[in-house]
Regions:
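Conserved Class I S-adenosyl-L-methionine
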Residues: 97-131
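A short acidic, Gly/Pro-enriched loop at the edge of an enzyme's catalytic core
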Residues: 37-52
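A short glycine-rich, Lys/Arg-flanked "PGG" loop and its adjoining helix->strand segment in the class I
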Residues: 67-83
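Class I SAM-dependent methyltransferase SAM/SAH-binding core
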Residues: 5-40
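Hydrophobic/aromatic residues located in beta-strands of well-ordered beta-sheets
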Residues: 19, 84-86
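A short SAM/SAH-binding and catalytic strip from SAM-dependent methyltransferases
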Residues: 49-65
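Short strand-turn motif at the edge of the Rossmann-like AdoMet-binding core
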Residues: 9, 87-91
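Active-site micro-motifs of SAM-dependent methyltransferase domains
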Residues: 38, 58-62, 113
Length: 131
């Protein structure tokens, strides 16, 4: 039997039973202490079936290079058809604007730039929408 992991990345104090809870700080008894801007992540290729990123992505990857490395790591550790659940504040909401720890707005369009099917479609049709 192959058992795939479920990760709660950047969990902070939101420890979820049945998930490997990962955070940069070990303030809340996390399962794995790891900085999500440090590569590679301590997980095998294709070993994860689900990832929760709840109000995490807007806090990491300030430089485009680091942000792209983060997405590449998620791709590397996820098995085919893995589910990644992303929760983020709206970039125009006061909570996003007023929080100095928010380093980048995350939008659906911005994330769609990394969807393989869309990139192949854009490549085929000619528009320069790929990163």
């Amino acid at each position: 039997w192959i058992i795939f992991m479920k990760l709660n990345l950047g969990c902070g104090n939101k420890i979820i039973e049945g998930y490997v809870n990962v955070d940069k700080f070990d303030l809340y008894n996390v399962n794995v202490k790891h900085d999500l801007e440090t590569f590679p992540y301590p997980f095998e290729d294709d070993s994860v079936k689900e990832i929760i990123l709840s109000h995490v992505l807007e806090h990491i990857g300030q430089s485009p290079e680091i942000f792209i490395k983060i997405l590449k790591e998620l791709y590397r550790i996820c098995k085919n058809q893995a589910l990644i659940k992303i929760s983020i504040p709206h970039p125009r909401h006061d909570n996003f604007i007023s929080d100095p720890t928010h380093v980048r707005p995350i939008t659906i369009f911005g994330l769609s730039l990394f969807v393989r099917d869309l990139n192949e479609k854009w490549e085929k049709n000619g528009p320069a929408n790929t990163p």
